Swiss-Prot record:
GO biological process per UniProt: protein import into peroxisome matrix; protein import into peroxisome matrix, receptor recycling; protein unfolding
Chain residue ranges for the region called AAA-cassette D1: 478-683
Compartments reported by the entry: Cytoplasm, Cytosol; Peroxisome membrane
Protein name: Peroxisomal ATPase PEX6
Coiled coil regions in record: none
Mutation effect (residue 528 to A): Cells are able to grow on a medium with oleate as a sole carbon source
Principal EC category: hydrolase
Keyword Methyltransferase tagged: no
GO cellular component term, pick one: peroxisome
Extra remark beyond the main annotation: Present with 1630 molecules/cell in log phase SD medium.
Gene name, Swiss-Prot/TrEMBL: PEX6
One Pfam family, short name: AAA
GO MF assignments: ATP binding; ATP hydrolysis activity; protein transporter activity
Outcome, altering residue 831 to Q: In PEX6pB2; increased amount of peroxisome-bound PEX6. Results in accumulation of PEX5 on peroxisomal membranes
Length: 1030
């Protein structure tokens, strides 16, 4: 229900007072109090989480009234406040009791509380100081109890609930980081004395765009229903007082000779707006596109002083949407609705924004449907997603007035005439976020300090625009390319154009390729692009022509193709190059931008016409963190949510761990992760509400939701998107590696944990080569490295790199290293590297493909120690003597680690313990005795086979025992039950428990043959001596 609201200066946990009518309607006559949820209106879309409060009856309050402490909503009522709220009772007064409440305490206060001899005395302090009463007071996360002294950090398991001194754990945390020093109630520092009224006839003040539309319910005084809401501006009460005007009065906003009339309203507390700033809608901001500071002054003009225009001439502002015939009817219909629903106040040279639903264009709403109610019936289904502008060219008035520039458009008296098209630059993003204001799906906001490739594109577009303003022809063109799909090439172009205020003409070339291999396809494709752009560009400058998926129509000519196909391909390549030059030369200030996935497929003849090429990589860790923050922001989480419950995330979410674990994923994958986590949190929300019998005030996404969604995304899309996975092999799974482990920590752990030590120019060691007999754990060791240091893991096999086409094998090597750089920190593991990189000159393959692979591998390894932080290369081989000698030089595989056969009983014991740590061993098993029985030419793989055979022997022995028990049971009972039925109905846990005995190990050891003979072992030792001696 909607109730009148008054804020008091009482303590934060003072009971809220309610009038008798509310108490009688919702309260229990037997109960002494009532619990309910108070939700304040907000300046923006969606709804805010409500606060559960403890309410008491106050007979002195007027009808349908509530009094609430202002501190509960984090502000002091020094200015006009909101005077209504939404109240919902808690059914059956069931408010959950919290398990724990964490308080952040000032250092001095914390030390004094810790000096108290009993914990109960600390609870009594909170009780008397902040009026926290057991099983009565409702506390909320982030409540400020005292500015600079005490705040509630967290409530568990719900963000708000009752405190029970006998059950709720109260946790006091010392504020050692001085976070409380900057924590205050909003408006707390303001004096209660009013400022001097009318001290300035004009004020210089900041002008900013409203972030969203303001509900009429928040306008004080309430305006007339026919008032023009496109000229409403807002500011704080202090500014109104200094200007000596009341809320709802006309004022003038001026700068550099431009004067606009606005109706100024007060912003009610609480709100998140800045003080001494005037907030205006986009229509007013468009009149001051380059002015962040304006002069406001009191106006003596009333509504009756503004004349009504007889005729008004408006022209369309050039742009992509205005040039599309399919949108003309819906645009004109929306324009007509804009002028008919209110008496609009306009001025010559005004820009009028018109938002419309482009999906309604298919319904072909005609202009002549004046007397039809179809438009009103469809209005509830509108969801605006596009914006066009109109420009007021001139107006005809009957008479002169006090204000010669402004006039009113009366839908019953004024004739509106649309004329030609005019050119106007769009508003840059820094002046107005039009997508957020009108509720459109927002384009991701790139931080130019974190995304250098976006900064490069912005700089190119900005330079091109500035040069065209000075009459300098730059003819800029940019080719965006990437090695992975869905990295945001189109998004960055849309952002850059909005950020700078540049028209965008976007064409997806995939829609042009259905008949791209026919003889007349070239003329059709070129004709379509020319027709779409040439009609717009004369009235849309500066502009960006963006052709997405350009490689779908441009292909490099292959000599093996059909001659007709070659001719066709050369034709379209030539025509596209000519088109590029024509547009950039004929329309100064126009920048051509194309995007491709694989730049190697773009013909060199076309690439030579592109001035700039920008590589768009997979996001780095810092970039992924920013993307997670964007998609977990309030405006993104609550967009297109049908439910009324707001969605947010827990305060303890670690964005750094999310960004680290999501290495190699694209922005689209991160968006999918957040959507999956939101759905999981929503399902849990309704399940918990059914269990506890009440509906929490918000849906909270937890760290576990995001972690599970990230793991699911990596598992599902690892093959399709090429994202590597982190294996699950720990040091405990490997035995006898103490020396090798120490060497690995020095090589890998040091650069990861202390990168500052290598800033002086010292090169990192990024290459490790494991060599030794087969079965000694080289592959297992590489996986353990990736797991221990949380590194992504690429395993590369030799045959995967080979390709029948010339140059493709080396390209495969480049792709492997490129994927690793995109997924860093990462380990590239080359198993049996001697088959990939043998000595050059000794191979008999035609074409020398192996030699070229070795050369490419050497080139990639040379960059590992300098510009590839977090990428480590590990090779494994049984025959290091077959490797090309250049691989073993410093800067490449400069760390050679020999993984030999365990040659002592202790090492063999360590391996046995690692392999059997998950076994259930009998008391008679003595692993040290077993190790003494094993010869010293057993490899790690041999010990793995020994333990596996022992487990198999134990299972066979238990199977025979079970069969014997089943046979005895059938003889005693006369039944004929099967073994499966016996397990289902009669068997106990002891019958299914596999216990490995010493006899199982001894039997397995007798049957085991070593995989490495003594002679072979001597050969490997000789190779080791040769390498270590060298």
């Amino acid at each position: 229900m909607k109730a009148s609201l008054t804020f008091s200066l009482s303590g934060i946990y003072a009971p809220c007072s309610i009038s008798r009518d509310i108490y009688l309607e919702y309260g229990d006559k037997k109960a002494e109090c009532l619990y309910g949820t108070i939700r304040l209106p907000q300046y923006g879309p969606g709804c805010t989480p409500g606060k559960i409060v403890h309410c008491v009856l106050d007979d002195s309050l007027p009808f349908c009234s509530i009094v609430v402490p202002s501190k509960l909503f984090g502000f002091m009522p020094t200015q006009p406040t909101m005077d209504f709220c939404y109240f919902e009772p808690i059914l059956d007064n069931v408010v959950p009791v919290l398990d724990s409440v964490t308080f952040l305490i000032n250092e001095q206060l914390y030390s004094k509380l810790m000096d108290l001899p009993q914990e109960m005395q600390q609870i009594q302090f909170l009780h008397y100081k902040y009026n926290i009463n057991s099983m009565e007071t409702v506390v909320h996360s982030r409540d400020i109890l005292t500015s600079g002294l005490c705040q509630i950090l967290n409530c568990s398991p719900f963000p708000q609930g009752l405190v029970d001194f006998t059950e709720t754990q109260l946790i006091l945390v010392n504020d050692t980081e001085q976070k409380l020093s900057a924590l205050k109630y909003a408006n707390e520092d303001e004096e209660y004395a009013l400022p001097k009224i009318g001290t300035n006839s004009a004020l210089s003040i900041d002008l900013e765009s409203l972030p969203c539309t303001i509900s009429r319910d928040l306008l004080r005084p309430a305006p007339h229903i026919n008032d023009d809401n496109s000229i409403y501006a807002f500011t704080d009460a202090e500014t109104l007082l200094r200007l000596d005007v009341t809320s709802g009065s006309f004022i003038t906003v001026s700068n550099m000779g431009c004067v606009r009339l606005v109706k100024l309203f007060v912003l009610l507390l609480p709100n998140g707006f800045k003080k001494r700033t005037i907030y205006a809608p986009p229509k007013i901001i468009a009149s001051f596109p380059d002015c962040s500071v304006v002069t406001i002054s009191k106006s003596n003009i009333g509504h009756t002083d503004i004349p009504i225009a007889n005729q008004v001439f408006i022209s369309r502002v050039g742009g992509w949407l205005q040039s599309q015939k399919c949108f003309q009817n819906i645009i004109l219909t929306t324009l007509k609705k804009f002028f008919s629903e209110s008496k609009r106040i306009l001025c010559q040279n005004d820009l009028i924004p018109i938002a419309f639903d482009s999906s309604m264009a298919d319904l072909n709403i005609a202009e002549e449907n004046d007397e039809s109610d179809d438009e009103d019936e469809l209005g509830q289904y509108y969801k605006n997603d596009s914006l066009v502008w109109f420009f007021v060219t001139s107006a005809e008035l009957d008479c002169f007035s006090k204000d010669n520039s402004h006039f009113i458009i009366d839908p019953n008296r004024t004739k509106l005439i649309t004329t030609n098209i005019t050119n106007r630059r769009p508003l840059p993003l820094s002046r107005s976020n039009l997508q957020r204001y009108y509720g459109f799906a927002e384009t991701f906001y790139y931080d130019l300090h974190i995304f250098p490739y976006v900064r490069q594109l912005v700089n190119i577009l900005e330079t091109s625009f500035n040069c065209s303003q000075r009459g300098i022809t730059l003819n800029a063109s940019v080719l965006l390319h990437s090695t992975t799909n869905n990295v945001g090439k189109a998004t960055m172009v849309r952002f850059a154009s909005k950020y700078l205020g540049i028209h965008l003409l976007e064409i997806d070339c995939l829609s042009l390729t259905s008949n791209s291999r026919q003889l007349d396809s070239t003329s059709k494709i070129i004709g379509y692009i020319r027709a779409k752009c040439e009609n717009v560009l004369p009235y849309a400058s500066p502009a960006v022509i963006f052709l997405a998926h350009l490689d779908s129509i441009l292909l490099d000519v292959n000599a093996n193709q059909d001659p007709e196909a070659i001719k066709l391909q050369k034709s379209i390549n030539f025509e596209m190059s000519k088109l590029l030059d024509d547009f950039t030369f004929k329309f100064p200030g126009t920048t051509f931008v194309g995007s491709v996935n694989n730049i190697d497929n773009v013909p060199s003849s076309f690439r030579s016409h592109m001035r700039f090429e920008i590589l768009v990589p997979v996001p780095s860790e810092a970039q992924r963190l920013r993307i997670f923050q964007w998609y977990l922001s309030s405006h993104e989480l609550n967009r297109d949510v049908q439910q009324k419950v707001p969605v947010s995330y827990m305060d303890n979410i670690s964005f750094s761990s999310l960004s680290s674990y999501s290495a190699g994923l694209t922005p689209l994958d991160i968006k999918s992760i957040v959507e999956t986590a939101r759905m999981t949190a929503t399902a849990r929300f309704y399940q918990e509400s059914k269990k506890c019998g009440w509906l929490p005030q918000s849906i909270l996404i937890t760290q576990e939701d995001l972690s599970k969604a990230t793991s699911k995304a990596r598992n599902e899309f690892s093959v399709s998107i090429g994202a590597p996975q982190i294996p699950n092999v720990t040091w405990d799974d490997i035995g006898g590696i103490d020396f090798v482990k120490g060497e690995i920590l020095d090589t890998i752990d040091m650069p990861l944990k202390h990168p500052e030590l290598f800033t002086s120019g010292m090169k990192k060691r990024s290459g490790i080569l494991f060599y030794g007999p087969p079965g000694t754990g080289k592959t297992l060791m590489a996986k353990a490295i990736a797991t221990n240091f949380s590194l992504n893991f690429f395993s590369v096999k030799g045959p995967e790199l080979l390709n029948m086409y010339i140059g493709e094998s080396e390209a495969n090597v480049r792709r492997v290293f490129q994927k690793a750089r995109e997924a860093k920190p990462c380990v590239i593991f080359f198993d049996e590297i001697d088959s990939v990189a043998p000595k050059r000159g000794n191979q008999g393959d035609s074409g020398g493909v192996m030699d070229r692979i070795v050369s490419q591998l050497l080139a990639e390894l040379d960059g590992m120690s300098t510009d590839a932080d977090g990428v480590f290369v590990i090779g494994a081989t049984n025959r290091p003597d077959l490797l090309d000698e250049a691989l073993l030089r410093p800067g490449r595989f400069d760390k050679l680690l020999y993984l030999g056969i365990p040659d002592t009983d202790t090492k063999q014991l360590n391996i046995l313990e690692a392999l059997t740590r998950k076994f259930v061993l009998d008391n008679d098993v003595k692993l040290i005795e077993l190790a003494k029985l094993c010869p010293f030419n057993y490899t790690g793989a041999d010990f793995y086979a020994l333990c596996s055979d022992a487990m198999l022997n134990a299972m066979s022995r238990i199977a025979r025992m079970v069969e014997k028990k089943v046979s005895q049971h059938n003889e005693l009972t006369g039944e004929n039950i099967s073994t499966r039925r016996w397990f289902d109905k009669i068997a106990t846990k002891e019958d299914t428990k596999v216990v490995v005995k010493m006899e199982d190990f001894l039997k397995a050891q007798e049957q085991l043959t070593p995989s490495v003979s003594r002679a072979e072992l001597n050969h490997y030792e000789a190779v080791r001596a040769n390498f270590e001696g060298a």
